[in-house]
A protein has these predicted regions:
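Intrinsic disorder
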Residues: 7-10
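N-terminal signal-anchor transmembrane alpha helix
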Residues: 25-45
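Membrane-interface helix termini and inter-helical loops of multi-pass transporters
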Residues: 49-62
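Short aromatic-rich membrane-water interface segments that cap or initiate transmembrane helices
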Residues: 60-72
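Core segments of transmembrane alpha-helices
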Residues: 74-85, 99-102
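Membrane-interface helix caps and helix-loop-helix hairpins in membrane proteins
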Residues: 108-118, 168-169
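Interfacial loop-to-transmembrane junctions
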Residues: 137-153
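Juxtamembrane boundary at the C-terminal end of a transmembrane helix
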Residues: 160-169
């Protein structure tokens, strides 16, 4: 219950942050900074994954790629996401930042706190948010929607990997 209350407070603070008429938030270049910060925060939680005994002992899918693949894929996806968000700024800013927030906390929930079931719920939420975001992007700028598709596809793949771990461990 305490964790739920903390999550509610965090989301309320995040919402207040988004609603502020901030020059920084209304600057389309800030989207690159937020994307970079999310990449760094997510990376910090999983930087020790190859040496993490908990992760190594999990039963993983035969489709689970080697760790270096994640290190190659995520920066590319973040780059494509940030270009997409930049092209449609500020129309999709709030939804983009919200999904970015959940993307960053997924890594912490899964890798740092070892809560794969909660991480699975978060990734399903991420998929829903990003389908909605991609629909919005398509209405505004078709190229932005196309740039976002690899991320959505990767989220489906990541949710499969996450589900496999939940079911088989």
């Amino acid at each position: 219950q305490k964790a739920l209350h903390s999550s509610k407070i965090s989301l309320e603070l995040f919402q207040d942050f988004l609603e502020k008429d901030s020059l920084f938030l209304n600057n389309r270049y800030s989207i690159f900074l937020f994307t970079f910060l999310a990449l760094i925060l997510g990376g910090l939680s999983s930087s020790d994954t190859p040496n993490d005994v908990w992760y190594q002992e999990l039963n993983k899918s035969f489709l689970n790629p080697p760790g270096y693949i994640f290190g190659l894929v995520w920066p590319i996806l973040y780059f494509l996401m940030s270009i997409s968000a930049y092209r449609t700024f500020p129309n999709t800013r709030n939804l983009f930042l919200l999904q970015l927030f959940f993307n960053a906390i997924w890594s912490w929930i899964f890798f740092a706190f070892h809560l794969p079931l909660l991480a699975l719920v978060i990734i399903w939420l991420l998929i829903g948010l990003n389908i909605k975001l991609n629909i919005d992007l398509y209405k505004l700028d078709k190229l932005s929607a196309i740039l976002f598709i690899p991320y959505v596809v990767w989220l489906f793949f990541a949710s499969y990997l996450n589900l496999f771990i939940v079911v088989n461990n």
